[in-house]
C-alpha cells in the first residue's frame, strides 16, 4: 500500500513510467534510473538500439529495467488473456545476447507465468507508445 501511494497508483493503474522512475530512484537512493519514451509504433531503429543497449548496460550493473507495456490480442506474453488489450508493467532482469531474448519478472502471473523469456523483438513491440525506466 505504501508503494502504491508513492507511485500515485489508483484503481485505474499507474499513469506514466515516470512515476516508476521517480520512486525507484527515491527508494534506492540513486539517480540511476531515467525515463525512456518509446512513442513510435513500431519503434525506430534508434529506439530499438537504445533499448537493447539499456538492457545490457543496466543488467550488467545489477539494475533491472521496468517496462510499461501495451499487449494487444495477437501480441501478448505467455498466459495473458487472449481477447483483450492489457496495459501493464513488468521487470526485465536478464538477457541472452546470443538468442536476443530477455528474462521477465511479471507480477501479474497471468496463467501462472511469473518468470519467462521473451524475444527482444517482442519486447520492443510491446513498449510503444509507452516507455521504460532504465
Give the ranges of each region predicted by the language model:
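Conserved active-site-adjacent core of cysteine acyl-enzyme catalytic domains
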Residues: 2-134
